[in-house]
Amino acid sequence: MGFQENKMPEVKRQRPGTMRLVDATQYRLPLAGVVSILHRASGAMMFALLPLVIWLFDTSVTSEISFEVFRSAFGAGIGWVPGWFVKLAVLGLIWAYLHHFIAGVRHLWMDATHSVTKEFGRQSAVVTLVLSVLFTVALGAKLFGLY
């Protein structure tokens, strides 16, 4: 009894609750967090589109005629979807692949070298974003026929 009575009352601290999606705009993520979320989003996007990409690849290599139909989609479009929108969608898929690949290399590098500091995380996040955008612009210029 003596020990229990002398115990100080615990102070209840207000703990943060679970973050809801609608509250996401109130938080300011560091750049490394933004790159991490984009890495996950690009991976999810590629996973969701994988059946379509496999079907398109299979269709394009079936015959020369099917390849020409596939190729004409970039110029004339598909049904009511204009060709520039098809190119824009493909450009989004190109960005997703490049960003996911570069961010994956970043994560592997950090795991292999134990470079887990706030400064390295910020610097490597900047490099990841810059490289993925530069490579996407270069491939997008080729996709839209600029060179």
Can you annotate each of these PLM segments?
Residues M1-Y147:
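Membrane-embedded alpha-helical bundles that constitute the cytochrome b-like, heme-associated redox core
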